[in-house]
């Protein structure tokens, strides 16, 4: 499956943002939910790995794309 670079960029940013939210929730939430949150984080981490691999391929095919690390940075408040 080939995705457009813009689609990959949006997906990477969304997964990174959700991962940050889940991490924060895991730190601040009721320990009873910890197992569920950790399971969700594993799924998001696997998705992030797949998206990173696809984006690295796109970097080789398209010019002008930002580095992956810039896409996953937490936005300044």
Swiss-Prot record:
Pfam families: T6SS_Tsi2-like (PF21643). Disruption phenotype: Deletion of Tsi2 is lethal in the presence of Tse2. It comes from the Bacteria. The keyword Iron does not apply. InterPro entries: T6SS_Tsi2-like, Toxin_immunity_effector, Tsi2. CDD domains: Tsi2_like. Keywords: Disulfide bond. Signal peptide: none annotated. Forms a heterotetramer with Tse2 consisting of two Tse2 dimers and two Tsi2 dimers. Formation of the complex inactivates Tse2 enzymatic activity. Immunity protein that plays a role in preventing early activation of toxin Tse2. Binds to a large surface of Tse2 and thereby occludes the active site to specifically inhibits Tse2. This is Immune protein Tsi2. It comes from Pseudomonas aeruginosa (strain ATCC 15692 / DSM 22644 / CIP 104116 / JCM 14847 / LMG 12228 / 1C / PRS 101 / PAO1). The lineage of its organism: Bacteria, Pseudomonadati, Pseudomonadota, Gammaproteobacteria, Pseudomonadales. The gene is tsi2.
């Amino acid at each position: 499956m080939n995705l457009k670079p813009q689609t990959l960029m949006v997906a990477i940013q969304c997964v990174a943002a959700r991962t940050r939210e889940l991490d924060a929730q895991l730190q601040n939430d009721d320990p009873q939910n910890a197992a569920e949150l950790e399971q969700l984080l594993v799924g998001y981490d696997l998705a992030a790995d797949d998206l990173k691999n696809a984006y690295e391929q796109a970097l080789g095919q398209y010019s002008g794309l930002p580095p992956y690390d810039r896409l996953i940075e937490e936005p300044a408040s």
